[in-house]
């Protein structure tokens, strides 16, 4: 995840760093790996406010990330690098040799078209 830092041309710009989104692929997420995420807005099952000052925010879809990576010794190709609204890391859509797709957390320096493999 590249981070852009600014020169201190004004007082408010001193020490300012932002995430550079230029490396992301501009496309829609894979629908088979997404599902809806219900937001509570600080309310419990009775509808009463249990956490004050918490709103609903923007509507999000949850991307199912494969943390296990249990397809050992099978190469996969990185198809997209996407923004994930539910975490601070970028995610990568990979396609295995048997045409199965999954999301993984994208490490620094990962590019589209790169081959990845998980082994024990």
Kindly give the residue locations of the regions a language model identified.
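Basic, glycine/proline-rich low-complexity segments that contact nucleic acids
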Residues: 1-87, 108-120
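Short, acidic/hydrophobic/Gly-rich beta-strand patch recurrent on exposed beta strands
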Residues: 91-96
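Short alpha-helix capping/helix-loop boundary micro-motifs
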Residues: 101-105
């Amino acid at each position: 995840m590249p981070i852009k830092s600014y020169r201190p041309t004004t007082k408010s710009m001193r020490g300012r760093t932002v995430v550079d989104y230029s490396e992301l692929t501009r496309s829609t997420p894979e629908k088979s790996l997404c599902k809806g995420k219900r937001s509570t807005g600080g309310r419990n099952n009775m509808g009463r406010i249990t956490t004050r000052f918490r709103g609903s925010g923007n509507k999000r879809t949850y991307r199912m990330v494969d943390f296990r990576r249990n397809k050992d010794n099978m190469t996969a190709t990185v198809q997209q690098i996407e923004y994930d609204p539910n975490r601070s890391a970028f995610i990568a859509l990979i396609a295995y040799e048997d045409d199965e797709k999954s999301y993984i957390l994208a490490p620094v320096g990962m590019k589209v078209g790169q081959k990845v493999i998980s082994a024990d």
